[in-house]
Every structure is written in C-alpha cells, then in structure tokens.
Amino acid sequence: MTIELKNEYLTVQFKTLGGQLTSIKDKDGLEYLWQADPEYWNGQAPILFPICGSLRNDWAIYRPQDRPFFTGLIRRHGFVRKEEFTLEEVNENSVTFSIKPNAEMLDNYLYQFELRVVYTLNGKSIRTEFQVTNLETEKTMPYFIGAHPAFNCPLVEGEKYEDYSLEFSEVESCSIPKSFPETGLLDLQDRTPFLENQKSLDLDYSLFSHDAITLDRLKSRSVTLRSRKSGKGLRVDFDDFPNLILWSTSNKSPFIALEPWSGLSTSLEEGNILEDKPQVTKVLPLDTSKKSYDITILN
C-alpha cells in the first residue's frame, strides 16, 4: 500500500512494505529519493532494526534474565526492512506505521517489542521518528536502529556525480575504521585518515571502491548533499545518532546513501553479546525509546 502526503513544497510517498519512505518530489516534480533501479540497488530507504550492519557470523548472543545464554540468527541490517508494517494513522501532515514481532523474529530476538515509525511533513522537511517500545514486563531490551535513505545523485539531468559535494556542519578532522566487505565487520583500531580540517567533501566514485564509509567520529550533526552547478540539494540532520554511514555501490551508481545509525557493525575486538555491544540502547520494561532524524530539501 502506498500513502501520500503533500503540501505546497513537497509530495512525499511511503509504503507499508518496510514502513519506508519511497518518494520525495519538490513542487516542480524533481525526485530526490533513489527509485530502486535494480541495475544498481533495489532498495530506497530501509529501516535497520534491531541491528545496524552485521554481527559476527550473523549470530547474536543474549544474556537474558530468565534463561541461560541464548544465540539467535540476525542477518545484516536486521529483520524489519522486508516485512509488512501496519498502517496505524494518516492525517494531513503525518503517517504512522507499526510492527510487532512474528514467531520467527522471536525465535532469534528474545524480546516482545513494538516499533512505530512516525513520518511528519513540515514545510520542506520530512521528520522520521522511531519509537521503540519494550513490551516485556521484566526484561530490559537492547537494540540498535538506523536509517538507510539513498538520494539521486545527480539530481538534475546533465549533471554528473562528481558535480556534487557533501557539506558538514562543522570543520572535520577524522579517520575511518577498516572494513571487511566479505563479513561486514569493522576494525575500529585500524584507521585511515579521511577528513583533514575540512567542511566539505567532493564526491567521486573512487570513494566507494572498497566499501561504505563509516564516520563514527564526526562532530557534525548534519550533512548537506549539494550540486556545485545547479545548487540543488538536501540536508540530513541526525542529532540522535552518533554515526553517519556514506555508501554507494562500486559500479558507478547514480545515488548516494546518507545513513544515520545508532550503532555499528561488530568490530574485531568486541564480543558477540548484544547487551554488551558499544552504543547499544537499552529500553526498560514497558518503556519507549525515541530517536529521530530530518531530511530537508534546500531548493
């Protein structure tokens, strides 16, 4: 099912499959969101839950209060992105989707939960709020959540990928960890200098020749994708997320993904117990945790 929100600036669409954003068009009909061309990547803006990235061998180990250690299988980016969400509510400027675990999810993730995703259209901005409720009455629930929106790049016909830059809200000097595409894991100790006293990064396909770029030490809480020719662009604000992942495929795809994540793939030096992973969010019984990010069209 497709749902549409519209105001004087934007027309935005969503679908119940994955509970995700599927289109952002301005008043001139220019599409900003990647449209899932399978030649390059058939995704658009999947929701990553209850993990971001990969676990070691896809296994999560739990230390729950009511049983011995337990191992569950959770594949890359979690299990909700290809599931059907329930459409809870639609009004003039917002839409709410929700999902609860099925039997297969509970076999591998030991917690009853409800994930609600609230999208709000306000002017030229779309806010995505993730509301994660722990439905357990006694167990604290660990989780990670992330967004994976991909944007057309170039946005305008006649422009090239290399005509675009990323602009950070702060001057940045940071390194990035080594990644292992074959396993999805990271080595947080083996790092390569990436940004050196700069606020912008010119895009080039060579950036993604190895893998995604994990920015886990950014000071900036927003990043802007902008054409140096037409000025067309958008901004992603991610105050609630400590990490930003930059990604495109290695075959010169006409998109870039700007991904706020609450956690990272498993690193070589950490263990497999989900509750002990760095940056894990823990929700008390019957409590709700909320995280949000914004996409703003700039023209």
Swiss-Prot record:
Pfam families cross-referenced by the UniProt entry: Aldose_epim (PF01263)
What GO molecular-function term can you cite, just one? isomerase activity
Q: Where is the signal peptide?
A: none
Q: Which GO terms describe its biological process?
A: carbohydrate metabolic process
Q: Which InterPro entries match?
A: Aldose_1/G6P_1-epimerase, Gal_mutarotase_sf_dom, GH-type_carb-bd, LacX
Its domain of life?
Bacteria
Gene3D superfamilies the UniProt entry points to? 2.70.98.10
Q: Quote the protein name from its UniProt record.
A: Protein LacX, chromosomal
Source organism (scientific name)? Lactococcus lactis subsp. lactis
Source taxonomy lineage?
Bacteria, Bacillati, Bacillota, Bacilli, Lactobacillales
Gene (UniProt): lacX
